[in-house]
Amino acid sequence: MSKRALVASLLLASLICSPVRADPIQDLQTLVKQGQFSQALERADSILASKPRDAQVRFLKGVVLSELNRSAEAIAVFQKLTEDFPELPEPYNNLAVLYAQQRQYDKARIALEMAIRTHPSYATAHENLGDIYARLASQAYDKALALDSSNVAAQNKLALIREMISVAGKPGRPVAPAPVAAAPQANKPAAPPPV
């Protein structure tokens, strides 16, 4: 074997045997799926240092911040995403869920209406909007009863709404971290991930 052939063989063998570097976004997605949110946040920040406008990484960072109960920071991330990529429905949906958790139902409603406007067939946003309307109805019936505690119709409606809310569980479904492969892309809205 010639020296040149030997060098070529060694080079080929080293390429075949060396571990393949994984995609940084795939690494981030894996960390999120595994619930390693602190590490995922570090990875997201690292990726964003070189790709600050990457919608998918920014979205995942918002999800991670939500999971870390850093709601104010998550809201800021999703809000900025809605400004930079207004055609993406998922940031609006997750923003609405965070607002709903803070009982800011009017803000949640507006965000969900924007999600639906950008992607009319986004079933999760429609479901979440229904939950918000139920919460708003509950508030309205509470107010009616505060003004007139003998209003039997309002009492009955409030009881129905409260029963519906308790059966349905917590308001709002974010785009969950499990289906991160469906995180938004900058050029078109992603199909709503199943939750």
For each feature predicted by the language model, list its residue ranges.
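Compositionally biased, proline/threonine/alanine/serine-rich low-complexity intrinsically disordered stretches
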Residues: 42, 73-76, 159-195
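Register position in tetratricopeptide repeats
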Residues: 33-34, 67-68, 101-102, 135, ...
